[in-house]
Amino acid sequence: MEEKFVAAWMAKREAAQKIGVRLRPMEPADAMKQAHRALSGHRESDGFRILADKKRLDLSLEALAVDKRFTGLFNDEEANNALMRLLSAGYRF
């Protein structure tokens, strides 16, 4: 399941970059560690605010983390953080 998540996240990052969102480089091998770190902290993921401004939060790590295909990869705190960030930014499911 992790491999599918990483592939999906890398594809979403690529799509975000194509619409002008600048993201820090990330190696696929570090993706899960980066995802857990981003979702367990208080800061939004890389590019979240810009994606919100562009109304493309579907490309965010937070949206991917609450996707039913991948919820098993994250603990309750991480999933709740992702959900609260999305709801606070006005994301519609």
Give each language-model segment a name.
Residues A15, S40, N75:
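Charged, low-complexity surface patches
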Residues E3, K33, D46, E77-N80:
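Generic alpha-helical secondary structure signal
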Residues K54-F93:
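Amphipathic alpha-helical binding modules
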Residues A8-W9, K33, A65, N81:
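General helical secondary-structure elements
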Residues E3-A7, M26, L73-E77:
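Alpha-helix boundary/N-cap detector
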Residues M10, K18-K54:
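Amphipathic alpha-helical packing elements
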Residues M1-I19, L83, L87-A89:
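Charged, compositionally biased N-terminal leader segments and the immediate start
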